[in-house]
Structure formats: C-alpha cells, structure tokens
Swiss-Prot record:
Protein name: S-protein homolog 1
A Gene Ontology BP annotation from the UniProt entry: pollen-pistil interaction
Keyword Secreted set for record: yes
InterPro entries: Self-incomp_S1
Signal peptide: 1-18
Pfam families assigned: Self-incomp_S1 (PF05938)
Gene that this polypeptide is encoded by: SPH1
C-alpha cells in the first residue's frame, strides 16, 4: 500500500509541474497555488556608467522575457518575482555599452547571493569597468564581472 501512495503522489506532483498555467484573480496563477512561491524578490539593474553612455539590457528567465531596455545614465530597471518552491528560479541579462558587453546571471538559488542581496533585493550597477553587486551585508558595491571588449 505504501508503494501505491508514493506512486500516486509522484503522479500528482508531475502533473502539477506540467499543468497549464492559468491566470486567476489578482494575477495569481494556477502554478502559484500548486507550486507556491517561497519568497518575494526584486532585481534592479542601474546604469552607473559615468561616461554618460546608454546601457542596453535584455533580461529573461526560462519562463519570462522582460524585453529590451535602453537605460540612460542613473536610470534603473527593476522587476519583482517570487522564488519557486523547487528553488529553480533563475534570471540572466545580456548587457551592452559602447565598447563592451556581457552575459551575466543576476538571480539564482545561492545562499551567498541571498546574503549579499539582503534576502530580498539584488541591485546590480553597470560601471565603466564592469558590473557590480550591492553587498547589503558590507554596505558596498562589489565587482562581479568585467566587460568583454566589443559588441
């Protein structure tokens, strides 16, 4: 009998993961009910290029394409989301400035990242030499990645 319960539970779980996602009242989806979000997060990308350049960004996850954005100096782009119960939420961005570009992960399931982001808000700032993550624990920007030369 125990094997049958485990088998039925496995079938229900796999159906929940593959079910069609339907938007319900207030923006809640069926997936949110079946696989609840663990915590709410915000990711922010800031153009801190002191040369006055426009920063091009294109951010996405497996499920969401956040579109192409051109950020002027000191402008920011933010999005909110809930990490899923499977801890598989993952966002990355392509960024481009006049003489450099990069593909960079901006959110993934990692306790060190969570600590640096203060368990709620990851702030990435593009500067002339690279991309920095605001470390809320130490109160300073930390260089995460340097620009690759070219387009």
């Amino acid at each position: 009998m125990n094997c049958i319960k485990q088998f039925l539970l496995a079938i229900c779980f796999s159906l929940a993961l593959t079910c069609q996602d339907h938007v319900l009242v207030g923006g809640t989806t069926t997936r949110d009910i079946i696989v609840p979000k663990i915590s709410e997060w915000q990711v922010t990308v800031v153009n801190g290029l002191t040369t006055g350049e426009t920063l091009f960004i294109h951010c996405k996850s497996k499920e969401d394409d956040l579109g192409e954005i051109n950020l002027k100096f000191r402008n920011r782009f933010s999005w909110n989301f809930g990490e899923n119960m499977l801890h598989s939420t993952f966002f990355w961005c392509y960024m481009n400035k006049d003489n450099g570009h990069m593909n960079v992960n901006v959110f993934w399931d990692d306790v060190i990242l969570f600590h640096r982001c203060g368990w709620k808000n990851c702030i990435w700032t593009a500067k002339t030499d690279g991309l920095y993550l605001w470390n809320s624990a130490s109160g300073e920007d930390v260089l995460s990645r340097k620009w690759e030369v070219g387009w």
